[in-house]
Amino acid sequence: MKNFLPTEYKKNEKLKINHSYLVEQFADYSKIFKEIEKVIRKGDYTLGKEVDLCEKNFAKRTGAKYAISVGNGTDALLLTLKALNIGAGDEVITVPYTFIATVGAIVTAGAKPVFVDIKEDYNIDENKIEKAITKKTKAIMPVHWAGRPCEMSKIYSIAKKYKLHVVQDSAHVIGASYKKKHLVNFGDACTYSMHPLKNLNVWGDGGFIVTNKKSLAEKLYLIRNHGLKNRDNVEVFGFNSRLDTIQAAVANYKMKNKLDNITIKRIRNATTLDRLLSANENVTTVKRMKHLKEVFHLYHINVDERDLLQKYLIKNNIDAKV
């Protein structure tokens, strides 16, 4: 572990990490302090230059024409639905196996979530989507669970057939791809979270919406800042969901210096686990597909004695959740 520890770490000293087992995601904090100090000295706290740079960096990372920074991943979902005029009387197809924010955003927008079951890889079963479509359906919201992309070719094809929007909950998949293409190419928008739990994390909350559609991006830039076109003119009613400049500085540092290594290590760790666990007949892992680049925000296994194994792992200082 010593290669992953910050320079401030002393032997036998416990480094408290609430949200991640990867110490590297929370290392280099003395260097990040310097980036934050630059922001403080400029007093540029709201939609500052670091935010502009962060949006450019994130757009490049995700292959998108436009990246709109927002306050958190939940707002990213909600604001996208609002910008697409999805609300009361509308239905949005998604999955029940997800964090509450996915469904919460749909309900808060005034729409009704319609659930489609997941497959063995924990992602939406694309072959069951069409049966869930009604006259009220306005969008499909696939959730790329645990860092594994959904089968977007089929989902996007269905969406185009029925003229539906596609809003991808991409909170777990920064750096992932589908058939060597960026996920933003399969729908209206992808939404991301930079919560401390995520592969790309800031020191608090942060989120992003990426899209290739200029009209959608322009509306989102307005909605995330009260609908203000400038200081005195409001074009639409919006929200206060700006990514603050300090968090943008943290994100910029991590995109430049940390994210690639974090992704590589997660893939390497998962590959090792796949290899070692394949010899254990009591453990079932997710089948890997060549056309999917996974980034392993989580690593899933299935066992019969789930609770017993969880207790054993935790007792041996290996975090495990159900």
Which residues are covered by each model-predicted region?
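Conserved PLP-binding active-site segment in aminotransferase class I/II-type PLP enzymes
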Residues: 1-83, 87, 108, 160, ...
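PLP-dependent aminotransferase class I/II
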Residues: 3-4, 22-23, 51-56, 64-67, ...
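Short, solvent-exposed beta-strand edge segments and adjacent coil->beta transition regions
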Residues: 14-17, 204, 294-298
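Conserved SAM-binding loop
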Residues: 69, 94, 115, 209, ...
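Conserved active-site segment immediately N-terminal to the catalytic lysine
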Residues: 168-203, 230-235
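Short beta-strand-to-turn element immediately C-terminal to the catalytic PLP-Schiff-base lysine
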Residues: 192-193, 207-212, 252
